[in-house]
């Protein structure tokens, strides 16, 4: 979430810094981390439900997802709809249609709502993956996800649209990122039984691996090579990094990830992500960076405690503890 917000900063006082850092492509990396974590968590929850109850309830899953995601999301769309006639945003009423139906990863929308493409990809994943697990089982679904990882680089090369950056936002070219997280959840225990994997994951030099992959990606000017190879490698390294710090949260990084402020920020992260674009990339007003950041976290905190939390309590009452999120 922080990486994405940093990539959206467009203020005069920070423009030199952000333009210098942009070459690291940290915004896209932040979204990839989010997708891998999402695939891992959702698959883990569904597998826990299967183990606990003997089955996966599609109805229960969609109720839980709706209560978790939609209240705050549609509150954002409602606020933008009210702001349009007041000329507080650049968006038009037509820009609300694609986000309303979670398809803004295929249609270009105004700057204030452009970030909803990632939530559209996420929602499309929710529609497909639980059904795969129910119809085909965990093992065959995992094999299907693995096959998709193999063909995704080819899809990224073929899916080029000069009028809109479809390659970066389309479900078919981004789903392998989520699938990597799904495979981590499915094969995590089996991977841990491999001594080679354990040694790599627990090596003191392991934290240098993600950085090395990012540096390598920066140095490759050939877009075809990037699409065919490095993106997939980056997805795998993100998954390995998640596994590493879940199993062995030691050192400065582990301490930071488990610190109180970071844990609190993690619980709050959905709301800042929802509201950041309205302030950081407002098409009509360019507010000072500090004002925008304070406004984002004030609105996000209100959204979390007033809108999200009541629905989260309802979600928790509808679900066994083992399958809550």
Outline where the language-model segments fall:
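Interfacial loop-to-helix transition and helix-capping segments at the boundaries
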Residues: 19-31, 90, 109-121, 160-180, ...
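Alpha-helical transmembrane segments of multi-pass integral membrane proteins
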Residues: 28, 178, 182-183, 205-311
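Aromatic-anchored segments of alpha-helical transmembrane domains
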Residues: 2-10, 82-85, 103-106, 148-158, ...
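Membrane-interfacial alpha-helical segments at the cytosolic side of multi-pass membrane proteins
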Residues: 2-6, 40-44, 78-82, 123-138, ...
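Transmembrane alpha-helical segments and their boundary/interface "anchor" motifs
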Residues: 28-31, 48-83, 98, 120-126, ...
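Solvent-exposed interhelical
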Residues: 123-151, 185-204
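Structural signal for the C-terminal ends of transmembrane alpha-helices
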Residues: 43-51, 82-86, 134-139, 183-193, ...
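Functionally critical transmembrane alpha-helices in membrane proteins and complexes, commonly lining
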Residues: 1-48, 70-72, 101-104, 121, ...
